[in-house]
């Protein structure tokens, strides 16, 4: 695996950089992400980002899905089937946050699925939590506007 990899999705997509703000107070939540392909990709995969919360104290109900974003990189203009080997791609994902979302701590997760089937790519990551083929990117605080 890639030394700089935060996570690998399937056989060929590597997340090399991700910036999650510590605090956010306005919609949308902007996430700069950088991916690299280990080989040319033949299929189209869709990136998804989920925001859960607010996070309850440990042992309480699992947090609800607050918001999500699904799409292709670069405003849906760069399908993964066009990625070449060693393609490096940095772009921002803007996840809308509801105006009435209560202040508190929220969790961000992301992953990829095959556009035609919806099947999620398996995820591997050395230092981050994974579940259900989803990478837990981290938490942020939503403050009062």
Language model feature labels by segment:
Residues 1-145:
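C-terminal luminal/periplasmic domains and tails of membrane-associated envelope-modifying transferases
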């Amino acid at each position: 695996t890639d030394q700089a990899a935060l996570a690998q999705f399937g056989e060929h997509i590597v997340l090399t950089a991700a910036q999650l703000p510590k605090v956010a107070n306005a919609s949308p939540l902007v996430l700069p992400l950088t991916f690299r392909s280990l080989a040319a990709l033949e299929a189209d995969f869709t990136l998804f980002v989920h925001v859960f919360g607010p996070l309850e104290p440990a042992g309480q109900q699992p947090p609800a899905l607050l918001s999500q974003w699904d799409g292709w990189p670069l405003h849906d203009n760069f399908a993964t089937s066009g990625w070449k080997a060693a393609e490096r791609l940095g772009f921002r994902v803007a996840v809308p946050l509801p105006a009435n979302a209560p202040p508190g701590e929220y969790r961000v997760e992301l992953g990829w699925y095959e556009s035609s089937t919806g099947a999620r790519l398996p995820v591997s990551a050395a230092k981050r939590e994974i579940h259900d083929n989803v990478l837990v990117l981290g938490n942020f605080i939503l403050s009062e506007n």
